[in-house]
């Protein structure tokens, strides 16, 4: 399934477009290089479509397996199509892995168990938690607060208006 991910220019029906700049492309390449030098295996990767211009800032989507929790691929925000997979056996391990980074913008949980869905959502240190999906249904109109070094999202939705409001109390005694 991961191999079917396609990267290319906008206007085509693709899963991923180009990175924002040459600098970001180089940053993503550095993540790939660091992972490979650490012996971390890319177990699957997508493809760049033939229609993609050679000068574009494209990066093949890659799925890395058995990424150590301390490796930068598991600790830093890549902002590119790289996915780090780290196995776990228990909920406690999963929570420790997810909460063991300095970031906490978004988390995802896949389970059919309704009690586990809520239990995990409450334990994960993230401003937004998706259950059985990722990135769908959040919408730009829903506020959320990233945790740690992730903070985008607080300015969305009705709740954000309070940050731009100045309250005033007027007390009048009559008579």
Task: State what each model feature region is.
Residues 1-68, 131:
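ALDH superfamily catalytic-core signature
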Residues 1-3, 51, 55-175:
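Conserved C-terminal structural/oligomerization subdomain of aldehyde/semialdehyde dehydrogenase
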